């Protein structure tokens, strides 16, 4: 740990701005220099002492280990997006554009996770980045962003439930779809009331199955490309003779591939959504777990996403009729289609079981993530206080119950418009997630400016993000541009349904932001004071929640055996 950071934590530098650095449970109540925004950080309608909140409601526990944190990030990401919605992406954009889309979103993910890592390791609190926007941008913006991000995960839980039964119907449709949804709805909800260490342990082993399966599929795909399947050597067969770029999505040839690329970004972003989950665990994870997991994000993305997309494009032609056939989402999965096209009989059934496990794991992570975001919003004073209440295991049970209730959206799959409902939910969650990514970058820019104002070098932080501040500005600009243009194709043949599908999350965010602004500051002329619209740098709170962490807590012990070395690399 850099010496300057140690001095800063112990209160020996920057005296003009310094407060004693203590856990959030005490730093707010004991600070003598609270600004309006800082005191609002844990209040509802009146100023509430953080220590009294913990006494009354309890608090989450830091029971997650490094392997748990890494697997939660993987478990929440590798799910419906990768295994199922990539089929729609491949069909719409072709193999090359799909790969380019994945690589482009990879750059956004890298920027966002780097920004998040620098902030979350410095101030490790539950639902961290929802609170960061509240502290460093504005309370109303933070409330809107946090609620929208929570909404995206609550809706994603419903989306996962809508798919799991259809995946099981790959084998049999004797059991009604609603029955499968109900079974997993109840099981996953109940499980999230157990202490977080049990959640972390189960998620570790389920996510381990995912990792082994994805690695196995990549090896299998490589062998098939080289000629082991019934079709002989495939190579780049489906990248030649016009197959590489697909058909585009416009009737004329003007810009049809650009339009396809932009339209396909939503599928790509939905697939990648969840890479930021490592920061959601900040309040329940050890410091070394956070830093280690964030450093490996890029490796996981390149292996689990980019390589998979590459081989899917090599083995499955974009115009394969199976990508759009009726009969359930699993039958549209490029993973299974690649196996079937290669003549493998048993593997599709084995991999379908993996997909079922994957969706269950993702749904589990959806509830966990949403509940911790809601807990963080309550800490920040922008959600009702009762969401802070925890059980003896440190689980915010009201937050869990409220988040899980949105699993009822899964029953939309039982209607005749089930596929349309899936697309609608996918667009809502992807766009909402992208808005949150953009504000993570905005928060990091404000965080860096506040550090600079206080004379604190980023070299002294527990984790220093790469390519800053350029990377943060890149993430902010690209995220907001994509949010605005991702649905532009609806204007070619405009109808209200498609418009709201594309932009409902944007509309919801604006309504929440304006509504919270007037709720917090009223309708008077002071409502539009610049300090209410954007927190002044001198008032940005970078003290509350900073933990007194010693060097040993950041040291990662060396692997003891080959098994430890393997997990040290992949997780």
From Swiss-Prot:
GO molecular function, one term: L-histidine transmembrane transporter activity
Renumbered residue ranges of the record's region Disordered: 1-38
Family annotation (PROSITE patterns): AMINO_ACID_PERMEASE_1
One cellular component (GO) term of this entry: membrane
Coiled coil: none
Segments passing through the bilayer: 69-89, 92-112, 148-168, 174-194, 204-224, 258-278, 297-317, 343-363, 393-413, 422-442, 465-485, 504-524
Induction per the UniProt record: Expression is induced during phagocytosis by host macrophages. Expression is also induced during biofilm development.
Membrane topology: Multi-pass membrane protein
Annotated keywords: Amino-acid transport, Cell membrane, Glycoprotein, Membrane, Transmembrane, Transmembrane helix, Transport
Record-linked Pfam families: AA_permease (PF00324)
One GO process term, biological-process aspect: amino acid transmembrane transport
This protein's record includes keyword Nucleotidyltransferase: no
Keyword Membrane: yes
Chief place where the protein resides: membrane
Localization per record: Cell membrane
Annotated glycan sites: 14, 495
Low complexity bias (residue ranges): 19-30
Primary role: High-affinity permease for basic amino acids arginine, lysine and histidine.
PANTHER family found in the cross-reference section: AMINO ACID PERMEASE, ARGININE PERMEASE CAN1-RELATED
Family: Belongs to the amino acid-polyamine-organocation (APC) superfamily. YAT (TC 2.A.3.10) family.
Name recorded for this polypeptide: Lysine/arginine permease CAN1
